[in-house]
């Protein structure tokens, strides 16, 4: 059976919940609107589920004009995105970039929810990927994360309780590559005809404590890192999925055929 794109997910707010899509425009920075917003502390350092597990319960949606964020037990935040305003110097890991501050009302909403002082910023400018010669917004280092459905099935076959794909927060899920087939692929074409896109898979994704965080409740456990460590430790890190960079832009659609153009 040919490989097929089965899931598309965008994350408008870094470390917030994902939004499943049936189609998405692929830009140099990844899926349109992906990681366009981010929370930072007073020093400009990004906030994430690594230190604030409650961020898993945030449900953002963004249409290019309004960012709506829902969380259990609170009135939703409906925020009109600000294009111009104070520009803050911010940091994602060791990468310095800038974001437009989105104002006091949004900051207060998130601060009250997370019980920590923070500001909401919107990406502006340019930021290079960690490697591969691409661009990225507020994602950790790469604009896309690709995981095969069979890779998760392989992992779940080793776990006492299966886990959903959202633990790994991929952009693209592909069925038909085989378990860890994404590790063997270097370039893919997704779609057919003039609208087809191409991506280059450039680096295995190192996994962190976020994978142990239930994306519905924010509660943490020991899996999947405990099991992944037994068979997916590569280059002194636990790896699952492949970071990727767009090479040919266009529109992605769930159900698109996937062709591996080049292997490792």
What are these regions (language model features)?
Residues 1-264:
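Metal-cofactor-dependent catalytic cores
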């Amino acid at each position: 059976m040919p490989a097929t794109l089965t899931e598309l997910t965008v994350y408008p707010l870094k470390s917030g919940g994902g939004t499943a899509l049936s189609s998405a425009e692929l830009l140099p920075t990844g899926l349109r609107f992906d990681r366009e917003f981010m929370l930072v502390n007073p020093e400009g350092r990004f906030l994430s589920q690594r230190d604030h597990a409650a961020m898993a319960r945030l449900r953002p949606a963004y249409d290019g004009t309004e960012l709506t964020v829902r969380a259990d037990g609170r009135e939703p935040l409906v925020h009109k995105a600000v294009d111009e305003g104070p520009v803050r110097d911010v940091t994602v890991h060791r990468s310095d970039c800038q974001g437009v501050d989105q104002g006091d009302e949004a900051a207060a909403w998130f601060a009250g929810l997370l019980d920590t002082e923070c500001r909401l910023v919107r990406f502006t400018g340019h930021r290079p990927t960690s490697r591969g010669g691409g661009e990225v917004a507020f994602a950790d280092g790469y604009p896309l994360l690709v995981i095969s459905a069979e890779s998760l099935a392989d992992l779940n076959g080793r776990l006492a309780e299966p886990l959903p794909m959202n633990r790994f927060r991929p952009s693209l899920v592909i069925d038909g590559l085989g378990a860890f087939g994404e590790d063997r692929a270097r370039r893919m074409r997704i779609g057919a005809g003039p609208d087809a896109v191409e991506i280059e898979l450039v680096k295995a994704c190192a996994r962190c404590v976020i994978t142990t965080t239930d994306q519905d409740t924010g509660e943490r456990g020991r899996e999947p890192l405990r099991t992944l460590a037994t068979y997916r430790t590569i280059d002194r890190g636990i790896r699952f999925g492949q970071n990727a960079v767009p090479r040919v832009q266009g529109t992605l659609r769930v159900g698109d055929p996937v062709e591996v153009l080049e292997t490792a």
